């Protein structure tokens, strides 16, 4: 496996290279900035690349953009845990980077060893991933400024809810689906995206700027409103519950029983207890692992509606594949088609999610 490490710090390049040397059959080269990286990508043609963001001569985002045009390859961003780092990293994911690792301590090389296993795991996985550049669709400032404001669902006796489970490759996929939903989509939507805390806040803010629907991070107990999108808080789990008889969601401490956080499994299980399977619309999207597969299969078997992203369109197909192994009959599609399916299901059911057989 040919790995290119791109960082303006010689010490950081050495530290990252030493971490990656433990990958079997790894052949590693380094680049000191974006221009050096592009030159080595074209001449050496690496299988995967790690990329810093802040560099002289040519920064990481400019380098990433040019590589995605000239010779796309899987790129893992190394970024800080700051809010600014989260915003820039999200932009990189939209531009085509397949994954990221948040560096503890920012530029402190010594602390990089804390995430050494994660760096190796993500670089190995990235080498097998599909590279996808998400098209940036524009929404006018006027459209965003006058978002569709829906009332709190006070008479929603069946407590109807839509849930998206997503991990690696998720931000662009989620935004594509939400952009293709009508402004009057009548269900609250919870997006469970595996991300650190500072990144989910930046993700929710980005979606809120770019979408017609209001978007909020679940950073406290919130009563769920129709037509509003909710992003689970990173480094926490999220559960669905009732507050004064109204459907609500709230963050909870991580449950060590689950491997990924926020946990799709825990979220969907709580939604089943609170709403019942037949009042749920669940969508499984791109990502590693099998988080939420068992619980979404239970929803499908309990007369709820479950869709999965077509695995061939995923950056990482593991999560949809895990669900399809359990319930192979559920509909699949591209992000755009999933938005169409969600819209049709909700329109046809009018006010109740009783769909019968799939």
Swiss-Prot record:
<dbReference type="GO" id="GO:0005737">
    <property type="term" value="C:cytoplasm"/>
</dbReference>
<keyword id="KW-0597">Phosphoprotein</keyword>
<dbReference type="GO" id="GO:0006935">
    <property type="term" value="P:chemotaxis"/>
</dbReference>
<dbReference type="GO" id="GO:0000156">
    <property type="term" value="F:phosphorelay response regulator activity"/>
</dbReference>
<feature type="domain" description="Response regulatory">
    <location>
        <begin position="2"/>
        <end position="118"/>
    </location>
</feature>
<dbReference type="InterPro" id="IPR000673">
    <property type="entry name" value="Sig_transdc_resp-reg_Me-estase"/>
</dbReference>
<feature type="active site">
    <location>
        <position position="194"/>
    </location>
</feature>
<comment type="function">
    <text>Involved in chemotaxis. Part of a chemotaxis signal transduction system that modulates chemotaxis in response to various stimuli. Catalyzes the demethylation of specific methylglutamate residues introduced into the chemoreceptors (methyl-accepting chemotaxis proteins or MCP) by CheR. Also mediates the irreversible deamidation of specific glutamine residues to glutamic acid.</text>
</comment>
<dbReference type="InterPro" id="IPR001789">
    <property type="entry name" value="Sig_transdc_resp-reg_receiver"/>
</dbReference>
<feature type="active site">
    <location>
        <position position="167"/>
    </location>
</feature>
<keyword id="KW-0963">Cytoplasm</keyword>
<dbReference type="GO" id="GO:0050568">
    <property type="term" value="F:protein-glutamine glutaminase activity"/>
</dbReference>
<keyword id="KW-0378">Hydrolase</keyword>
<dbReference type="Pfam" id="PF01339">
    <property type="entry name" value="CheB_methylest"/>
</dbReference>
<feature type="domain" description="CheB-type methylesterase">
    <location>
        <begin position="155"/>
        <end position="325"/>
    </location>
</feature>
<feature type="active site">
    <location>
        <position position="291"/>
    </location>
</feature>
<dbReference type="Pfam" id="PF00072">
    <property type="entry name" value="Response_reg"/>
</dbReference>
<comment type="similarity">
    <text>Belongs to the CheB family.</text>
</comment>
<feature type="modified residue" description="4-aspartylphosphate">
    <location>
        <position position="52"/>
    </location>
</feature>
<dbReference type="InterPro" id="IPR011006">
    <property type="entry name" value="CheY-like_superfamily"/>
</dbReference>
<protein>
    <recommendedName>
        <fullName>Protein-glutamate methylesterase/protein-glutamine glutaminase 3</fullName>
        <ecNumber>3.1.1.61</ecNumber>
        <ecNumber>3.5.1.44</ecNumber>
    </recommendedName>
</protein>
<keyword id="KW-0145">Chemotaxis</keyword>
<dbReference type="InterPro" id="IPR008248">
    <property type="entry name" value="CheB-like"/>
</dbReference>
<dbReference type="GO" id="GO:0008984">
    <property type="term" value="F:protein-glutamate methylesterase activity"/>
</dbReference>
<dbReference type="InterPro" id="IPR035909">
    <property type="entry name" value="CheB_C"/>
</dbReference>
């Amino acid at each position: 496996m040919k790995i290119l490490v791109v960082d303006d710090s010689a010490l950081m390049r050495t530290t990252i290279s030493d971490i990656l040397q433990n990958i079997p059959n790894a052949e590693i080269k380094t680049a000191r900035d974006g221009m050096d990286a592009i030159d080595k990508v074209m001449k050496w043609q690496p299988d995967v690349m790690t990329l810093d963001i802040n560099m002289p001569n040519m920064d990481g985002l400019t380098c990433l953009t040019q590589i995605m045009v000239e010779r796309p390859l899987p790129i893992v961003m190394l970024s800080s845990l700051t809010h600014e780092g989260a915003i820039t990293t999200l932009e990189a994911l939209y531009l085509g980077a397949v994954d990221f690792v948040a560096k503890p301590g920012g530029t402190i090389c010594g602390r990089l060893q804390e995430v050494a296993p994660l760096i190796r795991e993500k670089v190995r996985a990235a080498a097998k991933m599909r590279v996808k550049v998400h098209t940036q669709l524009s929404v006018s400032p006027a459209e965003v400024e006058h978002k569709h404001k829906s009332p709190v669902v006070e008479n929603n006796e069946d407590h109807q809810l839509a849930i998206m489970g997503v991990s690696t490759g998720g931000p662009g996929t989620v935004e594509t689906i939400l952009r293709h939903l009508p402004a009057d989509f009548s269900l609250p939507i919870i997006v469970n995206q595996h991300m650190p805390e500072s990144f989910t806040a930046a993700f929710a803010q980005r979606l809120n700027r770019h979408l017609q629907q209001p978007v909020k991070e679940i950073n406290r107990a919130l009563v769920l409103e129709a037509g509003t999108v909710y992003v689970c808080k990173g480094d926490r789990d999220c559960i669905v519950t009732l507050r004064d008889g109204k459907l609500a969601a709230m963050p909870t401490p991580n449950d060590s029983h689950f491997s990924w956080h926020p946990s799709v499994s825990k979220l969907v299980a709580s939604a089943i207890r609170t709403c019942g399977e037949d009042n749920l619309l669940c969508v499984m999207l791109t990502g590693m692992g099998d988080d939420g597969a068992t619980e979404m299969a239970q929803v499908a078997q309990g007369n709820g509606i479950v869709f999965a992203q077509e695995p061939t369109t995923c950056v990482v197909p593991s999560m949809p594949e895990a669900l399809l192994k359990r319930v192979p009959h559920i509909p699949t599609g591209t992000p755009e088609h999933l938005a169409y399916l969600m819209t049709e299901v909700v329109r046809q059911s009018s006010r109740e999610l009783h769909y019968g057989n799939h």
